[in-house]
């Protein structure tokens, strides 16, 4: 059992992930190096834009929803979605939590 929806070939998924490995790692590094302290919503704009652009490139319609204390929530859903198809909900945060300048002492490494 692969945990994938019916009709999704796990070998094809793995091949795609391997093919895009460097692209994924580059995005991960860019996100990890982005200064976005929790209490500085303005600093979140670059990360929001990066995530929104990448989601849009994958075929998602992206909306920015006002959030009283954190600036903006990103809401993304597939532009083309089959009725009754499986859905996923991904919840996370994109602030680095630490004060500005802290990331300089935390080098990115895999």
Where are these regions (language model features)?
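A non-catalytic alpha/beta surface segment that caps or lines the substrate-entry region
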Residues: 37-84
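Intrinsically disordered, low-complexity segments enriched in polar/charged residues with Gly/Pro
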Residues: 3-4, 17-18, 48-52, 61-64, ...
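Short hydrophobic/aromatic-rich motifs at helix boundaries and adjacent loops
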Residues: 1, 20-25, 46-47, 79, ...
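Conserved small-residue
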Residues: 35, 76, 90-93
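Residues embedded in well-ordered beta-strands
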Residues: 29, 75, 87-89
């Amino acid at each position: 059992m692969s945990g994938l929806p019916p009709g999704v070939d796990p070998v094809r998924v793995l091949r795609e992930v391997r093919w895009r490995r460097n692209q994924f790692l580059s995005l991960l590094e860019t996100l990890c190096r982005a200064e976005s302290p929790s209490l500085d919503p303005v600093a979140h704009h670059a990360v929001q834009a990066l995530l929104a652009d990448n989601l849009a490139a994958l075929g998602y319609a992206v909306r920015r929803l006002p959030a009283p204390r954190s600036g903006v929530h990103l809401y993304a859903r597939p532009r083309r979605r089959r009725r009754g198809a499986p859905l996923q909900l991904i919840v996370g945060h994109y602030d680095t939590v630490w004060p500005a300048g802290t990331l300089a002492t935390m080098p990115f490494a895999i």
